[in-house]
Amino acid sequence: MYLIFNTAIQNEEFEKIIGTRNHTEEFTNASGEAMTKEWITTNKFLTGEKDQPEGIQVIGGKTGTTSNAGSCLVLYSKKGEKPYISIVFKAENADGLYEEMTQLLKEI
């Protein structure tokens, strides 16, 4: 996961996308109907539901949850100008995920 994410952040557009809090798009579906869809980030650092550790700037990331993998987060952040990719897999729940990630970020 690190290798994929590290390659992806080399693309400036990817960095912009992962840091987007919400996005609304208008499109035409396969039946020819005009549609509007809104995407809202589930990254609690970006929504403000969880505080970013002092001195760390969260740029964005990828969240996910499955029964096998638990709650997961791949996060791109910076301390000063130095970039970091931090990963937490198999957290029991979202609260635990952000507690673990916060502790990891504090070690930077």
Q: Where do the model's predicted regions map?
A:
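Penicillin-recognizing serine hydrolase domain
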Residues: Y2-I108
